[in-house]
Structure formats: C-alpha cells, structure tokens
Amino acid sequence: MPMPRIHLTTFIQSPPQRVFDLVRHLSLIKKSVLGKHESIMSSAGSTMVSNGDTITFHAKHLGKMRSVMLRITEFEKGHKLTEEQVKGDLMNYRHEHFFKQIDNGTIMIDIVEYDLPKDFIGKWAGKFFLREYLEKIIKNRILIVKNYAETERWHALLG
C-alpha cells in the first residue's frame, strides 16, 4: 500500500531564490506553527536552515507532548529543499519543496509523503486527524511565505 501523499501547487509572484530563502527562514517556520502548545528548535547556526540542519517541532496532541525532528536532506539552492523525519511518531515523513521559475514569478510545489504507525492509534489518527492537520500546517506555511514574498515584508528578513 502506498504512503499517504499531500501535493500542493502554489503560484507566488516573486523570484524563486527569494521564495526558497523564505521557506527555509526560521522566523517564518516558527510563525507557521499553529497552536499555543507548539514550538520549534533548530540546529541551524543562522536564521535559515541549510543542508544537514535539523528542526525539532514540539506539540501537544491527544493529551501528550510529542516531538518530531526533521533533517534537511536535500538542498539545491533556489530549486529544491527536502525535510525528512529523523525522530518522531510517524514511521516515515518526507516533505519536498520544489521551486520552478516562470515569467512572472515562481511555482512552488510541496509534496509530502508520510507513513503512519501500524497500531490502532496510528490508524485512528491517520483516518481522523493527521492528514487534515498536516495540510493545515503546510497551507499556513505557504500562505505566510507567499505574503512575505509578494510584499515588501521580505526585506525585513532577507535584507
């Protein structure tokens, strides 16, 4: 059985390099975390994650604090960024961001594949909760990046 997949395509009226840099900017990643019981930490030595860096998300779900650590495993400046789970409740998690230049901006493609634990809780969470939750977080992150990239707000982060 194939892993569940989320595929989102977004037009952003901004150059690919700017969009790429905003996607990996820690302050925007932090803004995209939805709830008051959610936070992130990163191993990045600067304000932007790079190849090999980790990002750890902490969130309270189903009455329990949970952590997911992602590592940047693919990094093609201005073209592709991939985050993969190193530690967490899922069996697998992979989020690929692709950036395609077009005449009037960038097409950003987000592809997320994940695999749930095979136990009852994993199946239940996947059926009633996880896909919707992941889509909500990813769409929120896209909206924030788009808002910064298409306005003058990007200057405050990227100079």
Q: What is the meaning of each model-derived region?
A:
Residues 40-87, 140-148, 154-159:
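Glycine-rich portal/gate segments that line the openings of hydrophobic small-molecule binding cavities
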Residues 1-46, 50:
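Hydrophobic ligand-binding cavity/cleft-lining segments
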Residues 84-136, 156:
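Beta-strand/loop substructures that line and gate deep hydrophobic ligand-binding cavities in soluble
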Residues 7-13, 58, 71, 98-100, ...:
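Generic structural detector for well-ordered beta-strands
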Residues 12-14, 61-63, 74, 89, ...:
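Beta-strand elements of well-folded, non-transmembrane domains
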Residues 5-7, 65-69, 92-95:
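Short, surface-exposed coil-to-beta transition loops
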Residues 15-17, 74-80, 98-107:
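A short, structured loop/turn motif at beta-sheet edges
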